[in-house]
UniProtKB/Swiss-Prot annotation:
Signal sequence extent: none
Organism expressing this protein natively: Bacillus cereus (strain AH187)
Binding site for ATP: G108, A109, H110, G111, K112, T113, S114
UniProt KW Electron transport keyword: no
Name of protein: UDP-N-acetylmuramate--L-alanine ligase
C-alpha cells in the first residue's frame, strides 16, 4: 500500500491536496512545524497524521510531496534522496494529477479563492467534482469528471499546469517582491494562456485581459456590452444580488447569488460562462448559486451584540474597495469600520497612496502594525506613513481593541493576509469579558 507523505502538510495548498488524496481512498500522512495552523482542522477531521519534522518520517515505498517553502536541504528531503525516493514538488504533482480529469484552473490577481469555491459548488450540483481551494480546503471524489483548482501567479507557479480550461478574473500589479511591474505580471498570464488546452473564460472589462493571445477560444464576460456573457439589470439587495445574463446580446436567464458587490457578480458570471460552455444544466447552476455559503476568510460575517464582524483576506487596495462596497450593499444604514493590517513592507510601500484611498471609503479606519514577511528587509517604512494619509485613522494593537466598542451599531471589517485574526479574537474576547 502506497503512503503519500507531505513535507509541510499545513501549507494551504498542501493541506488541500492531502485531503483530496485521502478522500480518494489513499493513505496520507505529513509533517510540519508544531505550531497550530488553521488548515489542521480539516486534516484532523479526516484523521490524517501530522508529525513533527524528522528524517525518520521518510521511509522506502512512500511517495514524497514537498511544499515549495522547503528547500532541498530540508532534513526530510535529504533523507528521501539518500533512500533514492523521488521528491515531487507540490505544483508538479498537482499538474500530473489533474490530467486524469477535465481540469479548470481559476487564476487572477483577485477573486481566485472565491471563484474557485463558487465554481466547485456549482459544478458539484451537476457532476462529480474534485476541487482544491487556496483557503486550505480540498475535496476528492473517486469518480470525478471535473477537477477545479486555484492557480496562483506568484513566482509564476501556475506555469506548472496545462489545464483544459482557465478562468482569468483580472490582471493587476501585486507581489512587488517578485514582479517588477504590470507588464511582468501580464507576461506571466500570457504564458499561462498558451498552456490552456480547450478554452479561456476571461473578464473582458479588464484592459490587460483584453490583450491576451491564445491558441484556444477566449470567452469574455463582464458588464460591458462587448462581452460574450454580459450581466444586465443588476438588483443589489440586502439579501444578495439578482441579474440577467445576455449571451452575445441575447437574453439567456436570470440568476440570484448570495454575494454582494460588483466583484461577486463578475465571479458568478465567470462560473455561468464556463458551465454554459460545458453544457451544464442551467437549472442546476441557478440552484447552486443560491446555496453557496462562501469560502474561508472571504467576507465571513458574524453578529456580535449590536455590531457585525466581518473577517476578510483583503490585502490589496482593489480587494479593500470590493470588500467595503459589499459591506455597504448588505448594510446600507450602518457605520462601516475598517480594521486593517498591511501585509509585507514591499506591498505597503508600493501601494501606500492606493491603500489610503481605498481605506478612506470606510467611515472610520484603524490600522495595525505592518505584518512583515520573513524574506524581506523592513526598511524605513512604518504604519504611521499610512496613518498620516488617512483622515482620522487611529492605530490599534491587540491590547487596545476595546476602542472598537464605541461603534455601537457598526460593521467592523477585519482585513489582512497576516495575523489580523489575532486582533479580531482579542476584540471578541474583550466584548465577552465585558458582558459577564
Amino acid at each position: 500500500m502506497t503512503v503519500y507523505h507531505f513535507v509541510g502538510i499545513k501549507g494551504t495548498g498542501m493541506s488541500s491536496l492531502a485531503q483530496i488524496l485521502h478522500d480518494m481512498k489513499h493513505t496520507v500522512q505529513g509533517s510540519d512545524y508544531e505550531k497550530r495552523f488553521f488548515t489542521q482542522t480539516a486534516l484532523e477531521k479526516r484523521s490524517i497524521s501530522i508529525l513533527p519534522f524528522d528524517k525518520s518520517n521518510v521511509k522506502e515505498g512512500q511517495v514524497i510531496i514537498a511544499g515549495n517553502a522547503f528547500p532541498d536541504t530540508h532534513e526530510e528531503i535529504v533523507a528521501a534522496k539518500e533512500l533514492n525516493i523521488p521528491v515531487h514538488r507540490y505544483h508538479h504533482f498537482l499538474g500530473d494529477l489533474m490530467n486524469q480529469y477535465t481540469s479548470v484552473a481559476v487564476t487572477g490577481a483577485h477573486g481566485k479563492t472565491s471563484t474557485t469555491g463558487l465554481l466547485a459548488h456549482v459544478m458539484q450540483g451537476a457532476h462529480p467534482t474534485s476541487y482544491l481551494i487556496g483557503d486550505g480546503t480540498g475535496h476528492g471524489v473517486e469518480n470525478s469528471k471535473y477537477f477545479v483548482f486555484e492557480a496562483c501567479e506568484y513566482r509564476r507557479h501556475f506555469l506548472s499546469y496545462n489545464p483544459d480550461y482557465a478562468i482569468m478574473t483580472n490582471i493587476d500589479f501585486d507581489h512587488p517582491d517578485y514582479f517588477t511591474d504590470i507588464n511582468d505580471v501580464f507576461s506571466a498570464f500570457q504564458e499561462m494562456a498558451l498552456q490552456v488546452k480547450k478554452g479561456i473564460i476571461a473578464c473582458g472589462d479588464d484592459e490587460e485581459l483584453q490583450k491576451i493571445q491564445a491558441k484556444v477560444p477566449v470567452i469574455f464576460y463582464g458588464f460591458g456590452e462587448d462581452n460574450d456573457f454580459q450581466a444586465r439589470n443588476i438588483q443589489k439587495r440586502t439579501d444578495g444580488t439578482i441579474f440577467d445574463v445576455f449571451v452575445r446580446n441575447t437574453y439567456y436567464d436570470t440568476f440570484k447569488i448570495t454575494g454582494y458587490g460588483n466583484h461577486s457578480v463578475l465571479n458568478a458570471l465567470a462560473v455561468i460562462a464556463l458551465c454554459h460552455y460545458e453544457n451544464v444544466d442551467v437549472e442546476a447552476v441557478k440552484h447552486q448559486l443560491t446555496t453557496f455559503e462562501g469560502v474561508k476568510r472571504r467576507f465571513n460575517e458574524k453578529p456580535m451584540g449590536e455590531q457585525v464582524i466581518i473577517d476578510d483576506y483583503a490585502h490589496h487596495p482593489t480587494e479593500i474597495n470590493a470588500t467595503i462596497e459589499a459591506a455597504r450593499q448588505k448594510h446600507p444604514e450602518r457605520e462601516i469600520v475598517a480594521v486593517f493590517q498591511p501585509h509585507t513592507f514591499s506591498r505597503t510601500e508600493k501601494f501606500l497612496d492606493e491603500f489610503a484611498e481605498s481605506l478612506s471609503k470606510a467611515d472610520q479606519v484603524y490600522l495595525c502594525d505592518i505584518f512583515g514577511s520573513a524574506r524581506e528587509n523592513k526598511g524605513e517604512l512604518t504604519i504611521e506613513d499610512l496613518q498620516k494619509r488617512i483622515d482620522g485613522a487611529e492605530l490599534i494593537t491587540d491590547t487596545t481593541t476595546d476602542v472598537l466598542k464605541k461603534h455601537k451599531n457598526g460593521v467592523l471589517i477585519f482585513m489582512g493576509a497576516g495575523d489580523i485574526q489575532k486582533f479580531e479574537a482579542a476584540y471578541v474576547k474583550e466584548v465577552q469579558v465585558a458582558e459577564k
